[in-house]
């Protein structure tokens, strides 16, 4: 993977109001510790609200593995897409759309995007994806909702230890399988984990994702909470890994 660290050092008066953590500039609005509320639209589309900002992840068209779901036609301050594939970067929502690696400031959030291959063969089949990291509502958040590529050591440093990790777990050609996802959770020592991109129903010829069960088996011993389609996370979140199942 290629890491992108593009945030510049603030100077003068701005330095007094900014915090810099492991290459990520934290703006005052995002530093507020009121936590976030999370709403799931299915697949890997989540709306995260808190710190004065609305962040939408991976809006989809209702095709392939997302067939039968209601498309997330909502408004957000910023949309963070893993790629421009139709099931994780579709133009169905309104807001500033980010999909390329780099450093951005939107709605009081400092957002870092890190380039990665989408598949296990260096992106030769599905091209690149972007891993996202930002701080919102006093929480460090990492979005790995659309990748199957191994995370290099330097990228693990950039991603840090997330309070909240969103990660694909269903396997197939472009998403971590259960064992791979569990290994990433342990590498990053994630505190709260939201698994996404897995098949909830029976087999489908148009979807190569598997169920969530292999991931839960690989994470045996961790606390699992079934939180429904929405829930809130308020810091501090503790050190133990907790899996938050949304549907």
Where are these regions (language model features)?
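Structural recognition of the beta-strand scaffold that forms the well-ordered cores
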Residues: 56-58, 80-81, 112-113, 140-144, ...
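Sec/Tat signal peptide C-region and signal peptidase I cleavage site
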Residues: 28-34
